[in-house]
């Protein structure tokens, strides 16, 4: 349907005035190509990058990672930081739980000498630090661990047992309104780790809920639910956990996809074993009985031996990793248009 010429002129003048006053890109037509493709940062897990659809976690957005205790939430965020630092990006970790282990972080590949770290006293202080870092435009990734530990100042200064109904939820709601625009302007990825609580008196449906109210659920572009589905054993010794991550919400690609990988204690995500599994699934690695072969060369009997072989042959690992990424992520931007998933 044709638009009246006078209306077109008036609209063009209004758009020009808006862009002049608020900056280029402050308003645009939804079908335009500019600013539609979302830049991402790898999670450190190829299968999770594929499940996210865009090849990783989106920059300029809010991401929530939640799950039960000791299921790998902090490990996953540290792997994201390590992956970002390998690309020369600046990262910050807001340790509201005061529980970050720098030795463990270093084992996961985090450059602790260049990692910004804060252990705030109150929830307001933590969120103000996030806002200041994002407005600087110099920080690429910010992790907050965790929402449940963001204690409002009034609660800290009050007595134990005082009622503070909805205080944390109001604090988070106000912070989300303030942070969302700044993150978009600075292209900063903000990851919130969250814990699970049980709703009392729920007879039907899922009784689980996350802390901090509903604001984070609405403002998050991606929500990841992380669960342990089994144990990794070396003989009788448990050396890791089988982990499943479900993409519960995704504004940049199709949601509800899942990724499964191993988290090894003291080592993080087993990327070598993950490549073996993906290689077999996509017929780049041959499996005959218990033997694994790549390009006609036997690389091990059993997954553990094949994984060890990949660790000892980085050139083979890099070749297989490159092939799988080209195969699985070549359409990563297919659904990154805002008109597809809002």
Curated annotation (Swiss-Prot):
Q: What compartments host this protein?
A: Cytoplasm
Which keywords belong to this entry?
Answer: ATP-binding, Cytoplasm, DNA damage, DNA recombination, DNA repair, DNA-binding, Nucleotide-binding, SOS response
Record's keyword annotation contains Metal-binding: no
Cited Pfam families: RecA, RecA_C
Cellular compartments per GO CC: cytosol
Q: Does the keyword RNA-binding apply?
A: no
Give the family this protein belongs to, as stated in its UniProt record.
Answer: Belongs to the RecA family.
How is this protein named in the record?
Protein RecA
